[in-house]
Amino acid sequence: MKLDFVNSMVVSLPSSKVLTYGWNFGSMLGMVLGFQILTGTFLAFYYSNDGALAFLSVQYIMYEVNFGWIFRVLHFNGASLFFIFLYLHLFKGLFFMSYRLKKVWVSGIVILLLVMMEAFMGYVLVWAQMSFWASVVITSLLSVIPVWGFAIVTWIWSGFTVSSATLKFFFVLHFLVPWGLLLLVLLHLVFLHETGSTSKLYCHGDYDKVCFYPEYWVKDFLNVVVWFVFIFFSLGYPFLLGDPEMFIESDPMMSPVHIVPEWYFLFAYAILRAIPNKVLGVVSLFASILVLVVFVLVNNYVSVMSKLNKFLVFVFIFVLVVLSWLGQCLVEDPFVFLSMVFSFLYFFVIFLLFLVYYFAGRVFM
């Protein structure tokens, strides 16, 4: 029975005849998730979740633990690798209209939200100047929630400010959430394998598909090349994607001149800063991810609109890249104005993507 289940997942799974490297992203994400859990578990052996010792314990891992620096560098850059493939996987889903598989799409959005929360907590654990103040700013945004906002912030902080108790809370969650992610990923795969993945040829039945093995196995060997590039980058340029403030121990009495999150949060951070009202800014921040759920309302596939869909997806990627650049710029003109413009374009392009297929279903079907 167990062998039949494994066989249905990785051998006889009906797969699209159109073999593209876009299908590597999901398998690569699974590999990186396992890699992050292994390296993170090793780091947890030596990490101290006390506010007075956290930053020093990270330095201890880097300088005193045998090969500790390798694990820390690989885990740090592994988060960036994970988000690169996570966003590529999302873009591929938009490109091939994978949101037609409703349960797969919704479970994927939930995984995205959990991964972003997980990455943020891991960022805070370094307890450096930038990560400490980022935790203060981001968690305090929850205070805009009516009635319960202040109570929620106090509960997360475990007090009236970010402290050692907050660090312990984040450390426990950062250690436990990946195991929940594994279950969600398994559920994501089960939902996917109920129908098979989408195809730009839109193959309707299993009779018009090929087995996962051997073609898709061979295709996945590209992941080996990616791993070699990742290791070379991590060892040659270990902190290129980091911030210099992350090498300074946190000081609650002095904030950095310019608070900037990790690169994979910059687009959402730019949207947050673009809105002058705090409540609307927080709503826009969460909406930037949750708005992707609206695609499950699309119930049709109209091939005459596929070219327009692909064009809009590329426009969406361009807008996302520009927003990420604006997110690390200073809060001054013209960057503030440009953030407003591209924040509007971000939601407008998503609205157009949805609108195209909503009305196409009424006109052509």
Curated annotation (Swiss-Prot):
Q: Binding positions for a ubiquinone?
A: H193
Binding of heme b b562 occurs at H75, H174
* Keywords attached to this entry: Electron transport, Heme, Iron, Membrane, Metal-binding, Mitochondrion, Mitochondrion inner membrane, Respiratory chain, Transmembrane, Transmembrane helix, Transport, Ubiquinone
Q: How does it sit in the membrane?
A: Multi-pass membrane protein
Q: Where are the transmembrane segments?
A: 25-45, 69-91, 104-124, 170-190, 216-235, 279-299, 311-331, 335-355
Q: Which InterPro entries does the UniProt record give?
A: Cyt_b/b6_C, Cyt_b/b6_C_sf, Cyt_b/b6_N, Cytb/b6-like_sf, Cytochrome_b_C_euk/bac, Cytochrome_b_N_euk/bac, Di-haem_cyt_TM
Q: Is RNA-binding one of the keywords UniProt gives this record?
A: no
Superkingdom of the source?
A: Eukaryota
The record ties this protein, via SUPFAM superfamilies, to:
a domain/subunit of cytochrome bc1 complex (Ubiquinol-cytochrome c reductase) (SSF81648), Transmembrane di-heme cytochromes (SSF81342)
- GO CC terms of this entry: mitochondrial inner membrane
Report the cofactors. heme b
Q: How is its cofactor bound, per UniProt?
A: Binds 2 heme b groups non-covalently.
GO biological process: one example: mitochondrial electron transport, ubiquinol to cytochrome c
- Record: residues binding heme b b566: H89, H188
UniProt GO molecular function = metal ion binding; ubiquinol-cytochrome-c reductase activity
* UniProt cross-references to Gene3D superfamilies, sorted A to Z: Cytochrome Bc1 Complex, Chain C
Q: Which family does it belong to?
A: Belongs to the cytochrome b family.
**What is the additional note?**
Heme 1 (or BL or b562) is low-potential and absorbs at about 562 nm, and heme 2 (or BH or b566) is high-potential and absorbs at about 566 nm.
* Quaternary structure and interacting proteins, as annotated: The main subunits of complex b-c1 are: cytochrome b, cytochrome c1 and the Rieske protein.
The entry's function note states: Component of the ubiquinol-cytochrome c reductase complex (complex III or cytochrome b-c1 complex) that is part of the mitochondrial respiratory chain. The b-c1 complex mediates electron transfer from ubiquinol to cytochrome c. Contributes to the generation of a proton gradient across the mitochondrial membrane that is then used for ATP synthesis.
**Protein's UniProt name:** Cytochrome b
